[in-house]
Amino acid sequence: MSQELYSFLAGLPQSDIKVSTCTAAGKNLRQIMILLTPSSEQISWSQLKEFTRKNAANALSLSNMVMGMTSILCSLNGHQYSSCWLVLIGYLLDLADGAVARQLNACSALGAKLDDFADFTTFGIATSLLLWSKELMDNILCMCYVLSVFIRLCFFSSGIPFMYRGLPCIYSSAILACVSLLSGGNMAVLRATAIAMILFMVSQSFYPHDRVLESQAWKKVIYAGGVVMVLCSSFPSACVYYLLWSVSYILFPTSLWSCKL
C-alpha cells in the first residue's frame, strides 16, 4: 500500500475505513457479476442457434408439404409439367429431413408427424392428381392411390429394425412423376404404372431404410446428382435419372440401398 493511502486511512475514523472497504468490495462484485452474466445479445444468439437446431429438419418437412400443396394447385390448373417437378423436389426434401434431424440430434414426435403429413400431401394427394381425368375409373384410381399411401404410412410398420414393409411412397411417386413427364401424360401408361405402384406399396415385401445421406459416399453422390438434375438439367435426362434411381431401389433393395451397407 502506498504511503499516501496509508496516511489517508490513518486519519480516518475506523468506521469510515470499514465503509470505504465495503463500498469498494461492492463495486468489484458488481463488475464481476456484469462480466459473468451473458448479455441479452448473447442470450438471443444462443436461443436462435438452439431454435435452428431443433427446427431445421421440421423446416425441410414443411418445405416438402409446400411443394405438395403447390403441386396440387398446378394439377388443378392444368400445369402437369410443373406438378411433376414439384413432386421430385419433394422427393429430395423427404430424403434430407430425417438425415438432418438425426445429425443434429433433433428427432421428435412433432417432427415425425410433420414428416407423415408432408409425405401424405406430396406423395399421396399431389401424386394421385397426376392420374386425374374426367373418366370415372381414373378418379377411382386416384382415390385408390391415396388410400394405398395412407395405409402404407399408417399401418405398415414392419417392427424390424432398418426395414420398411411395403414400398416407401416417395419412390412410387417419383416413378409416376417421371413416367408422366416422359410419356407426355399418356393415361394408359400412367394407369398401368399406378396400379403396379399400389401393389408394391401394400405388399408384404420388406425394403431397407434408405438413409442415402448417412451411408456410403456413392449414395451421397447419387443424391447430389439428383439435386443438380432438378436445378440444371433438361427434363428427359433428369427423369431418366430419377426413374433409374427409384427402380433400382425396387429391384435391388438390399444389395444396393440398405443403410447398413
Predicted regions and their residues:
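C-terminal membrane-associated helical module and adjoining short loops/tails
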Residues: 1-45, 164-261
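Short, amphipathic, aromatic/basic-enriched membrane-interface segments that mark the entry/exit
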Residues: 50-59, 108-115, 159-166, 209-218
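Membrane-embedded alpha-helical segments that form the functional core of polytopic membrane enzymes
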Residues: 54-113, 127, 140-146
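Lipid-exposed faces of alpha-helical membrane segments in multi-pass integral membrane proteins
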Residues: 56, 60-66, 86-89, 121-124, ...
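Hydrophobic positions within alpha-helical membrane elements
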Residues: 69, 99-102, 120, 124, ...
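Helix-coil boundary and interhelical linker segments in multi-pass alpha-helical membrane proteins
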Residues: 70-85, 121-143, 178-192, 234-240
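C-terminal ends of transmembrane helices
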Residues: 97-107, 148-163, 202-210, 253-261
